[in-house]
């Protein structure tokens, strides 16, 4: 196969990435897509991503949002969204997925997010929000918070290693 043919075939998206997910995971992706599709038109566009960041008190530079949009070959509908994430998540573990999600809110790229941002993320009404009692239970587990900042890598490790039970019972 020529270099050009290899390059062309490697860029082709088959959609088979979606087949690797079970129904529960696909439902979770649908919920995430619904959160990101701020204007509810079935397509995630630049405006949706800007609004999503704004809803979390963040301002994302146009260059960052443009780079996210360019990862897709066209409009990002649910199928394209699932395919993009399927390619990214193949072989990843839940901890890496959670770290990646929190990293979107890491303005300084330092491995930490503001405690207030963590609470906003966890109580976001568009996903499966934690209520006040669940947030209080989380604090009983002594999450890695220092100086108003959360070490989200340590937090992700804590909740993915079975420690979420410790968070609630501590």
UniProtKB/Swiss-Prot annotation:
Pfam family name, one: EF-hand_6
Subunit structure: Myosin is a hexamer of 2 heavy chains and 4 light chains (two regulatory light chains and two essential light chains).
GO cellular component: cytoplasm; myosin II complex
Record's keyword terms, sorted: Calcium, Metal-binding, Motor protein, Myosin, Repeat
Name of the protein: Myosin regulatory light chain 2
Gene Ontology terms, MF aspect: calcium ion binding; myosin heavy chain binding
GN (gene name): mlc-2
GO biological process: locomotion; nematode larval development; regulation of muscle contraction; regulation of nematode pharyngeal pumping
């Amino acid at each position: 196969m020529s270099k050009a043919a290899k390059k062309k075939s490697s860029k082709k998206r088959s959609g088979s990435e979606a087949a690797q997910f079970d129904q529960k995971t696909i439902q979770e992706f649908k919920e995430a897509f619904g959160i990101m599709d701020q204007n509810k038109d079935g397509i995630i566009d630049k405006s949706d991503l800007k609004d999503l960041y704004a809803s979390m008190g963040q301002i994302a530079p146009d260059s960052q949002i443009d780079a996210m949009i360019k990862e897709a070959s066209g409009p990002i509908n649910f199928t394209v969204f699932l395919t993009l994430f399927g390619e990214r998540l193949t072989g990843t573990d839940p901890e890496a997925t959670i770290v990646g999600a929190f990293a979107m809110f890491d303005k300084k790229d330092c491995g930490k997010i503001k405690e207030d941002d963590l609470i906003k993320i966890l109580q976001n009404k568009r996903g499966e929000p934690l209520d006040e009692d669940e947030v209080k239970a989380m604090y009983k587990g002594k999450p890695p918070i220092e100086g108003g900042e959360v070490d989200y890598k340590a937090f992700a490790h804590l909740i993915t290693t079975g420690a979420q039970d410790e968070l609630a019972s501590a």
